Amino acid sequence: MGIAHTEWESVIGLEVHVELNTESKLFSPARNHFGDEPNTNISPVCTGMPGSLPVLNKDAVRKAVLFGCAVEGDVALFSRFDRKSYFYPDSPRNFQITQYEHPIVRGGCIRAVVEGEEKTFELAQTHLEDDAGMLKHFGDFAGVDYNRAGVPLIEIVSKPCMFSAEDAVAYANALVSILGYIGISDCNMEEGSIRFDVNISVRPRGSRELRNKVEIKNMNSFTFMAQALEAEKRRQIEEYLSHPNEDPKKVVPAATYRWDPEKKKTVLMRLKERAEDYMYFVEPDLPVLQITETYIDEVRQTLPELPHSKYMRYITDFDIAEDLAMILVGDRHTAHFFETATMSCKNYRALSNWITVEFAGRCKAKGKTLPFTGILPEWVAQLVNFIDRGVITGKIAKEIADRMVSSFGESPEDILRRHPSLLPMTDDHALRAIVKEVVAQNTASVADYKNGKAKALGFLVGQIMKRTEGKAPPKRVNELLLAAMRDM
């Protein structure tokens, strides 16, 4: 990016549509379930049949209130539904029921760590609305599946408070974590149960103005989100630099774009509609939604410990690295796995590394995540304890981890019992002979160590471990090696 580009900054906000995991739809008794045969989970309300009337799903309201409490938002005692009018084949009523003027939650915040810095991102509002159906294309014709029509959504709208792609991705990750912890959505991007629309504008660095924003629709991966934001930032800056004397509103008009991952560029879909184009008006078939402070307090009491609080506790109580703590708390199942393991192992730093690095990598290669493999937390704790007590070496521990992931049903103790060849070298006489031989064959490295070059010791240890196939106890190797060099 050229010098001229560095004099500009992004201003980013996100609109996130989250499908709530209720049993039925927002305004009808039809089943809310992904993957069923087309048009099997429908009712007259879903398909806009004349005379059908909406009835609000109580569980969807509770889940929206729970989210509002989780993000410390202001849950409204009175909220209202509105009709958003537009014509599209996947919307059989020709309108969506949403909350335009009086949302169920205002404000709130999402806390995230961005490149080591803790940031707080403010929310504008969260509102309830129903989803549209899906168009499915089959060569020379298209079909409409109304199974998704009427599925309950919360739309979470942030303020324009992010200034980089890194901010946006960190915010999105933190939001997904919160939704997972409170259990109101499965957040499956591939199935569309969470969809990210990003709004971005650019301005000269140091300016406070908000220029026309461009919306990039339906980001279905965090990688694409980051790429799209960077590409759109460059596009807008280049437009402004190419037309310095023109009205900024005409240079970059408000519009909706999509991301083309193959061309690595944003592609125009349409110019932005105005609010009046949707002809919002109060939904006549639904009363005002009224809830009480007592109800809100009861819902708030069901909140679990949330990711940010858990993150701070892990750093303080367990003294583990911030980056590993972030990985652990990112998923509630992984966090639970770690905390269960800490009941059997007090080497928290090593434990966090084995869970987030060693086992996570091995499980990913198998297409699984550690908490859902059958490997018990106590087994990972046992593996770390074996290393700490000198029962096995680090190299042997990795071999055992390989076998644990291959079988998903054996503890380290079971594996050692079945494969005694994995046990470390216990013949001290043989180990002394190997140490003596390595020292004799590497006199230059011995001299380097005696002259203050600490790396030489690591080289000598490596030679010994190589000859013992990693089975020599590291502590004993160091003792014998230092003694042998003193005797020279």
Curated annotation (Swiss-Prot):
One of its GO terms (molecular function) is glutaminyl-tRNA synthase (glutamine-hydrolyzing) activity. Pfam families: GatB_N, GatB_Yqey. It comes from the Bacteria. It is an enzyme of class 6 (ligase). It catalyses: L-glutamyl-tRNA(Gln) + L-glutamine + ATP + H2O = L-glutaminyl-tRNA(Gln) + L-glutamate + ADP + phosphate + H(+); L-aspartyl-tRNA(Asn) + L-glutamine + ATP + H2O = L-asparaginyl-tRNA(Asn) + L-glutamate + ADP + phosphate + 2 H(+). Keywords: ATP-binding, Ligase, Nucleotide-binding, Protein biosynthesis. Its EC number is 6.3.5.-. InterPro entries: Asn/Gln-tRNA_amidoTrfase_suB/E, Asn/Gln-tRNA_Trfase_suB/E_cat, Asn/Gln_amidotransferase, Asn/Gln_tRNA_amidoTrase-B-like, GatB, GatB_C_1, GatB_Yqey_C_2, Gln-tRNA_amidoTrfase_suB_CS. GO terms for biological process: glutaminyl-tRNAGln biosynthesis via transamidation; translation. NCBIfam families: gatB, PRK05477.1-2, PRK05477.1-4. Heterotrimer of A, B and C subunits. HAMAP family: GatB. Belongs to the GatB/GatE family. GatB subfamily. PANTHER family: GLUTAMYL-TRNA GLN AMIDOTRANSFERASE SUBUNIT B MITOCHONDRIAL AND PROKARYOTIC PET112-RELATED, GLUTAMYL-TRNA(GLN) AMIDOTRANSFERASE SUBUNIT B, MITOCHONDRIAL. Allows the formation of correctly charged Asn-tRNA(Asn) or Gln-tRNA(Gln) through the transamidation of misacylated Asp-tRNA(Asn) or Glu-tRNA(Gln) in organisms which lack either or both of asparaginyl-tRNA or glutaminyl-tRNA synthetases. The reaction takes place in the presence of glutamine and ATP through an activated phospho-Asp-tRNA(Asn) or phospho-Glu-tRNA(Gln). This is Aspartyl/glutamyl-tRNA(Asn/Gln) amidotransferase subunit B. The gene is gatB.
